[in-house]
Amino acid sequence: MKNIRNFSIIAHIDHGKSTLSDRLIQTCGGLSDREMEAQVLDSMDLERERGITIKAQSVTLNYKAKDGETYQLNFIDTPGHVDFSYEVSRSLAACEGALLVVDAGQGVEAQTLANCYTAIEMDLEVVPILNKIDLPAADPERVAEEIEDIVGIDAMEAVRCSAKTGVGIEDVLEEIVAKIPAPEGDPNAPLQALIIDSWFDNYLGVVSLVRIKNGVLRKGDKIKVMSTGQTYNVDRLGIFTPKQEDTTVLECGEVGWVVCAIKDILGAPVGDTLTHQHNSATEVLPGFKKVKPQVYAGLFPVSSDDYEAFRDALGKLSLNDASLFYEPETSTALGFGFRCGFLGLLHMEIIQERLEREYDLDLITTAPTVIYEVQLTNGEVVYVDSPAKLPPLNNIAEIREPIAECNMLVPQEYLGNVITLCVEKRGVQTNMVYHGNQIALTYEIPMGEVVLDFFDRLKSTSRGYASLDYGFKRFQAADMVRVDIMINSERVDALALIVHKDNSQYRGRELVEKMRELIPRQQFDIAIQAAIGNHIIARSTVKQLRKNVLAKCYGGDVSRKKKLLQKQKEGKKRMKSLGNVEVPQEAFLAILHVGKDK
């Protein structure tokens, strides 16, 4: 056991985590040169296309160190985006140490900090590593000082390497062996295995990634899931070398995968503890704190026949992604679907793409909203995650919106732009610290504003240099109203949105204009209106298509023309009372882009 090292690789987006993982695998001979490819751990097509890591992946490698011993390294490559930070905290729970990778050109960024603090809170040994020293812009001395100054860990001794060219990778491995402690645990105690991750395999059922904390797990053991009390047989177990390899036993302190022919998706929840059926452990291992979704959106299948398939797909996906929340929802405009909760907009995009690709579904998404706390006049407090569920205005005492605490690291020359952006988003500054050329800004900004397009705009006003990390802080009373969109004086529930009163006129007007461009012309006038309660704040009309009924009267009497026009007018009126308007998919997405084109 003293030769096992469990560690994660944490870093900001694009600081080279996945490339470093590739080099470690190559150096330790996990894959032959023929099987080696770039970002070998990013196995999903989506990850390859976007060049980001979404799911944490684990690998077991054997490394023969300079002291002649052979060490077993279990490491987990983690994502860098804010939206996937729960993946990082889950990975860290299975480790004793973490490699903090910092780009020697870019320096410390917000996510570096956030992930590092998560690791320190969990009492992990953090080993700083300066990556990309082959770049002309690299300045390892400055960055080492920055790490000490901002993060507060000693970085003068930090290993300098270049994951791309392979310089200094040996030193990284030696550093891991020297600095990261061996796992603690008792191989003779009752079995306790923590489920770090699960996914659904069509042939094997549920496959779980586990970390053995105490005891030993063998093939053929009878095991029990502690939260449900269900018992299963261990059919297969093994490790990833990145390929799935079968073994017969997982020793204390190891990380590996287990298949127990669990067919039920809820059979082995992530964060649960596995133990033996007979000599079972009494205590459950501390799991992970449940992540609360920050953004909610309705997902509806385009054709209602896909509803069942959609439900199964969501179930299988939520097994693999513990932070996805969903419940059934019906909408008059879109039929049956689900209200889903996500950690952020990127997470929402990824989930929608995975559903469309892996499960072959066509989906319509409604505009994302955050969750509001509503105090009713009778003293009751309700939580509203969709504009359609907002109680009538006269029953509401006050609406409280969620406030996010945003930590940003900004280079000095972009400070002005970033502050202007934060103020425009109704932000309140709470802190500002200078670290050399970088400035650490802390703002409290309403979650609804952060979620919409804050990240994109922050990147564009600072030319990509500012970085952001945010988390939910509290609910705070605000003057929020619901803007309804009416088409031919019928409310379309899927288009309603909750906005701050100051922005309501502007958002309503803009949305109505957008809808006018997107709704195709019909045989009759279509009135599109935005309303708060019964008060109309904006209107525009999609003009009707009409035939020129006077074409066949050459000259002729004016009363004849009047008669024909009158007849056409009555026909149109009848059509309007019977006709209903098709709202195209683009119109539902228009809400997302309101206010982006300025």
From Swiss-Prot:
Subcellular location(s) per record: Cell inner membrane
NCBIfam families xref list: lepA, small_GTP
Residue span, tr-type G domain: 2-184
Protein encoded by which gene: lepA
Binding-site residues, GTP: D14, H15, G16, K17, S18, T19, N131, K132, I133, D134
Cross-referenced PANTHER family: TRANSLATION FACTOR GUF1 HOMOLOG, CHLOROPLASTIC, TRANSLATION FACTOR GUF1-RELATED
Cited function: Required for accurate and efficient protein synthesis under certain stress conditions. May act as a fidelity factor of the translation reaction, by catalyzing a one-codon backward translocation of tRNAs on improperly translocated ribosomes. Back-translocation proceeds from a post-translocation (POST) complex to a pre-translocation (PRE) complex, thus giving elongation factor G a second chance to translocate the tRNAs correctly. Binds to ribosomes in a GTP-dependent manner.
HAMAP family linked to this entry: LepA
Gene3D superfamilies assigned to the protein according to its UniProt record, in alphabetical order: 3.30.70.240, Elongation factor 4, C-terminal domain, Elongation Factor G (Translational Gtpase), domain 3, P-loop containing nucleotide triphosphate hydrolases, Translation factors
GO biological process, one term: positive regulation of translation
Recorded topology in the membrane: Peripheral membrane protein
Membrane in keyword set: yes
Record protein name field: Elongation factor 4
Keyword Zinc-finger: no
Keywords assigned: Cell inner membrane, Cell membrane, GTP-binding, Hydrolase, Membrane, Nucleotide-binding, Protein biosynthesis
Main localization of the protein described in the UniProt heading: membrane
One Gene Ontology MF term: guanosine tetraphosphate binding
Catalytic reaction list: GTP + H2O = GDP + phosphate + H(+)
GO cellular component, one term: plasma membrane
Family to which the UniProt record says this protein belongs: Belongs to the TRAFAC class translation factor GTPase superfamily. Classic translation factor GTPase family. LepA subfamily.
Source species of the chain: Haemophilus influenzae (strain PittEE)
EC number: 3.6.5.n1
InterPro entries: EF-4, EFG_III/V, EFG_V-like, EFTu-like_2, G_TR_CS, LepA_C_sf, LepA_CTD, LepA_IV
